[in-house]
Amino acid sequence: MIIHPKTRGFICTTTHPVGCEYNVLEQIQSTRARGVRSNGPKKVVVIGASSGYGLATRISAAFGFGADTLGVFFEKPGTEKKPGTAGWYNAAAFDKSAKNAGLYSRSINGDAFSDEMRAKVIEIIKSEMGGHVDLVVYSLASPLRKMPSTGEIKRSVLKPIGVAHTSNAIDTNKDQIIQATVEPATEQEIADTVAVMGGQDWELWINALAQADVLAPQTRTVAFSYIGTEITWPIYWHGALGKAKADLDATSRRLDARLQFLGGGANVAVLKSVVTQASAAIPALPLYIAIVFKVMKEKGLHEGTIEQADRLLRERLYREDGQPAAIDEEHRLRLDDWELREDVQAACKVIWEQVTNENLFQLTDYANYKRDFLKLFGFERADVDYDADVNPEVAFDVIEL
C-alpha cells in the first residue's frame, strides 16, 4: 500500500515501515560514531523497548557496548489493510540490525505489567542469556495498567492538583496558540496515576528478577523520569503525574538498598524534553519543546533521545574512569542538566511571554517540532519515497504473549 501521514489530535494514525526502519538505523549510526566500548553492560533487559527513550537505550547498549538485549513492549503488527504501530516497525528494525551485526536480540510483545511477562522474561534469561542480566531499564509510558493481582484497570491522567490550570498551548492541527485549561485531578485519579506511572511495577519487576536469582553481581537498574521547568510544573511535576514520579523516586531508593547485596544499585534518570508520542499528549509541552529546542540548538546543546541514552550509559552509569555517576540530592541521575541551565531557561521564559500566532514559526522551532513528531511515525524523511508501494506486514523474531 501507499502510506501517507494522517493525524488526529495529538496522534498520527498511520505509520511508515521503511521510515521507521531508517529512524532506527540513524540512531544506530549515531551510537556507533561514538565508538564501541567493552566496559559496560553485557546483558540488558529493556521494559518498554519499542520507542522513545527505551528504544534509544536498547540501541545504545547493543551498538555502543555490544550488549545482548531482551526487549519487552506492547505493539500491533501491520495487516494487509492497515499499518502496524511505529513501535512494531522500530522493534523489527532493531532486531534485524542487531542480528545482522551478530548481536543477541530477543523481543517479547505483550503486557509488561503482567506476571506472565515477568515469568517469560525470567525463563528467557535462564535459557538463552546465560542465567543473569546486569542492566534492567524501565521505560514504560502507558495510559493504563491492568493490575496483576485483581485484573482491575487503572488509568493515568495529566491533570493539575487542587486548582484548574490555564496556560499557553499549541493547537497542533491549526498551528495556533491557544489557552488550554485543565481541571484538577480527583483523589482517585491521583491514586490511579501513581499506580500506573509510579514505581510499583518497576519494583515488582526487580523483586521478581531478584527472587529468581537472575541478577548478576553489580546489576544496575534505571527508570526514566521528567521534571521539566516552572513553565510545565503545574500540569506535570506539581500535578498527578508528579506524584507518580515522586513515588518512582521513593521506589528507586528502596531498590537501591535492595541491590546493595549484589554491589549494584538503582536510580531514576531525569531526562530532557524531547518529541515523543508521550510528550505530545501533555498540554503546554509541545509549545515549550518548540521553544527550548530553538534555544538549545542556537547554543549548540540540542540532544535527541539517542544522544541522551548514550550520555546516560557512557557518562553516567558506565563512566570510562570507573567512577560512580554524579547524582542529585534525591539520588537521581540528571540528564536534563543542559536544558535546565540558567541561560537556557531565561531565554525560554522570554520567548514564552512573547509568542503569538503571528511569530510562532519565527520565535520557536515549531516547524521542526512538527517534522520531528511525524518522523516518530516514519514520515518526513528525505530518503524515503512516500509515493512508493510498501508492504505494511513486517515479520520478525518476536515472542507473542
UniProtKB/Swiss-Prot annotation:
Coiled-coil stretches noted in the UniProt entry, renumbered to this chain: none
Enzyme Commission code(s) on record: 1.3.1.9
Catalytic activity: a 2,3-saturated acyl-[ACP] + NAD(+) = a (2E)-enoyl-[ACP] + NADH + H(+)
Disulfide bridge map: none
Any Gene Ontology biological process: fatty acid biosynthetic process
Site (Plays an important role in discriminating NADH against NADPH): E75
Name under which the protein is recorded: Enoyl-[acyl-carrier-protein] reductase [NADH]
Protein species of origin: Xylella fastidiosa (strain Temecula1 / ATCC 700964)
Gene this chain is encoded by: fabV
